[in-house]
Amino acid sequence: MASLHDLWFILVAVLFVGFFFLEGFDFGVGMATRFLGHNELERRVLINTIGPFWDANEVWLLTGAGAIFAAFPNWYATMLSGYYIPFVIVLLALMGRGVAFEFRGKVDHLKWVKVWDWVVFFGSLIPPFVLGVLFTTLFRGMPIDADMNIHAHVSDYINVYSILGGVTVTLLCFQHGLMFITLRTIGDLQNRARKMAQKIMGVVFVAVLAFAALSAYQTDMFTRRGEITIPLAVLIVICFMLAAVFIRKKKDGWTFGMTGAGLALTVGMIFISLFPRVMVSSLHSAYDLTVANASSGDYSLKVMSIAALTLLPFVIGSQIWSYYVFRKRVSHKEPMTY
């Protein structure tokens, strides 16, 4: 029978899977503004496709971080101290992007609009890349000592494997965002988004395969829990193969579902390969942080479980409702907030 700290690890995993699925297409749309939007009006249409959703989608990241803080304080302390600068970079990028969303539609000066457009682009590019780097180093292993402190060098953060992880996550988000655009726009903009998604499909596929191959060499992803992770890896490949088929048939909804499933399964596979560890020590396996030695006490976990079970359905329900209310496609002929 699963213990409370096991269940909270699963909850944290679900929150981050949800974050990358939902915020992933937000990031992708933000990146697409520089490549797909040919003028200010088209970029405005693109931003308004995610206008009603982006702030609620970010809540999944905040909730995930909050769950780690409450349920696994040692994990939170070790990770935040060891990854302090990268997390600050991510937060600054997210804050800048949020400010840009709000301000670009409220200024008439073209130069300022261009400035905010670049902030939207980099604020959408930096977080998935940095988070991809961090996740790969998380299960590749960091020099964590017996006191749960990280003593890392630059090469522990920046190496071929971590950069490939960052690039792969960024490409997955970009493609996911392009498919979201096809569901939320009409006409020429929709067609260009579909064509661009089709063009980069091969690049994304190669990146995913390269990441899987290097993961097999650099980590124990496919040996520790191979009976689960290997079928998941095959399923991820199938998702992207189906996405390639659906996009040729212009079945945008199915393609979006497949790209989202591939992204979500990739994140889920990382958490499965970690369990019961939460951070891997490259110094000695005895120094690994696990769900047992990094978690809060049983009483705290019980109280938080009751609160989570009570509130989570309302949060998920309200977000589903918002997607239903704002399901209409965005056009330059419609009033736009951003």
UniProtKB/Swiss-Prot annotation:
It is found in: Cell membrane. The chain crosses the membrane at residues 7-27, 50-70, 75-95, 119-139, 163-183, 196-216, 227-247, 256-276, 306-326. Its EC number is 7.1.1.7. It comes from the Bacteria. Binds 1 protoheme IX center (heme b595) per heterodimer, in conjunction with CydA. Binds 1 iron-chlorin (heme d or cytochrome d) per heterodimer, in conjunction with CydA. GO terms for biological process: aerobic electron transport chain. GO terms for molecular function: electron transfer activity; metal ion binding; oxidoreductase activity, acting on diphenols and related substances as donors, oxygen as acceptor. InterPro entries: Cyt-d_oxidase_su2 (IPR003317). Its cofactor is heme b; heme d cis-diol. It catalyses: 2 a ubiquinol + O2(in) + 4 H(+)(in) = 2 a ubiquinone + 2 H2O(in) + 4 H(+)(out). Keywords: Cell membrane, Electron transport, Heme, Iron, Membrane, Metal-binding, Oxidoreductase, Translocase, Transmembrane, Transmembrane helix, Transport. One of its GO terms (cellular component) is plasma membrane. Pfam families: Cyt_bd_oxida_II (PF02322). It is a multi-pass membrane protein. NCBIfam families: cydB. Belongs to the cytochrome ubiquinol oxidase subunit 2 family. Heterodimer of subunits I and II. This is Cytochrome bd ubiquinol oxidase subunit 2. It comes from Bacillus subtilis (strain 168). The gene is cydB.
